[in-house]
Swiss-Prot record:
InterPro entries, alphabetized: DDOST_48_kDa_subunit, OST48_MD, OST48_N
Main location (coarse class): endoplasmic reticulum
Annotated Pfam families: OST48_MD, OST48_N
Name under which the protein is recorded: Dolichyl-diphosphooligosaccharide--protein glycosyltransferase 48 kDa subunit
Lineage, highest ranks first: Eukaryota, Amoebozoa, Evosea, Eumycetozoa, Dictyostelia
Length: 426
């Protein structure tokens, strides 16, 4: 009996846990490698993922793998550590459909990039530099080495602590550069300094890419909240990189990669809305109508709870920030911003517009590093009933006076006309 109760408890707990993770990134991950020896040189990276519960399936780039079957995707995440392979079993169009399905992609490059990887990057708004080029910096490089292509990089993304969570340790980077397009969906996670430039690795001839426009690590968060991250260095994820040092101090490479990958695979920065409350607190009309029926110019209270997923704690916690609320019927009649409290509740009182129709109450959050939140609720707003208007409207007093003066004048004229007799001439 005891074993039965333990089994039932385990099943219920598993169901609850799966329901939580159903709202965030899944764990089925395909890892495509140029060479299976990368499993050894990058063992710490893969081990950290497995410790988090990710189910990794390793395949060589020339192995036939199907991402989608009968409309269902076989994986939730895709790791492409095959920058030079021209023999991928799936095309850039397949990867694009994978992203359109809401799945996540992490891929890395080297100083030689295959056309498949270039096409995938181009679809995601990233233009990779020519083959056999590297990013150089004659001022910000590892002084323990004579190689000026080993950068000491600390130009992290601003205004988005959710991606790197305030990481301030510099990292070592050696790889190819890229440029991101002017697109609000693209994030420059790590860029070169103002003295960095891209050049041929052998001849040293520089290209047009230079300064802070040199992308080292960039991401795309699609409109369906799928996340794609590209690193110009495959070595960034290696064991050697994780334990590298800068001026005899530990570098931030390992911490940088862990935070970057956890964000890419949707362990953080995922928002959800719940507990909507839209109630009437006062009315402009004189009649007593049902409380769930809204009429024009009613005073209403709007309340919405917003939470974000904490991958470390494995649960939803309140999101404290700002939220944009719009009341729309073709055009927005009301647009305002609401600050959340410590419990993640966003509340506001406002008066409905003096226009009737079916209105959309749209709450949205569009913030770098967080998933896009669009909560939509539709509600009809009715005009006043015939018995809801005031008996006399002050603005119409001049018209009332005109009507009554006309009536009185007509009455007086009628009396005079009826009872006044003209004197006959004799």
């Amino acid at each position: 009996m005891m074993m039965k109760s333990i089994l039932i408890t385990f099943i219920i707990a598993s169901a609850l846990l799966s329901s939580v993770f159903a709202d965030i990134g899944g764990k089925r991950t395909l890892v495509v490698l140029d060479d299976l020896s990368i499993k050894k040189t990058h063992s710490t990276f893969f081990k950290n993922l497995e410790n988090k519960g990710y189910k990794l399936q390793f395949e060589q780039s020339n192995t036939k793998v199907v991402l989608e079957k009968y409309g269902d995707f076989n994986f939730d995440n895709l790791i492409l550590f095959s920058p030079t392979s021209e023999s991928l079993s799936f095309s850039s169009a397949d990867v694009t459909r994978f992203i359109d399905g809401g799945n996540n992609v992490l891929f890395a490059g080297s100083n030689v990039i295959s056309e498949n990887i270039r096409d995938i990057a181009a679809e995601c708004g990233m233009e990779i530099e020519e083959d056999k080029t590297l990013i150089f910096d004659h001022f910000n490089y590892d002084k323990s080495q004579s190689d000026h292509s080993v950068l000491v990089a600390d130009q992290f993304i601003d205004d988005s602590p959710i991606i790197l969570q305030g990481l301030n340790k510099p990292i070592l980077f050696k790889g190819i550069g890229h440029k991101i397009r002017n697109n609000p969906l693209n994030y420059a996670i790590l860029t070169g300094s103002s003295t960095a430039f891209s050049a041929k690795a052998i001849s040293g001839v520089s290209t047009k890419l230079m300064g802070k426009s040199c992308g080292l690590v960039s991401s795309l968060q699609a409109r369906n909240n799928a996340r794609v991250t590209f690193s110009g260095s495959l070595d960034l994820f290696s064991d050697k990189s994780f334990y590298s040092k800068i001026d005899n101090k530990e570098s931030g490479n390992k911490e940088f990669v862990e935070r970057l990958v956890s964000w890419t695979f949707q362990e953080r920065g995922i928002l959800r809305a719940s507990e909507l409350e839209l109630v009437k607190i006062s009315t402009e009309s004189n009649s007593t109508v049902a409380p769930d029926v809204f009429t024009i110019k009613d005073e209403v209270k709007y309340s919405l709870k917003v939470e974000e997923f904490d991958g470390i704690k494995g649960k939803w916690v309140p999101y404290v920030g700002s939220l944009q609320l719009e009341v729309i019927m073709l055009d927005p009649y009301i647009r305002t911003f609401i600050k959340g409290d410590a419990n993640g509740l966003y509340k506001i009182h406002f008066k409905l517009p003096d226009v009737y129709g079916v209105f959309t109450f749209e709450a949205s959050i569009h913030k770098s590093g967080y998933s896009t939140l669009d909560h939509i609720y539709r509600k009809p707003i009715l005009p006043f009933r015939h018995d809801s208007y005031e008996r006399f409207i002050p603005a119409a007093f001049p018209y009332y006076a005109t009507c009554f003066s006309m009536l009185i004048g007509t009455f007086i004229f009628s009396i005079i006309f009826l009872f006044n007799k003209d004197q006959l001439n004799k």
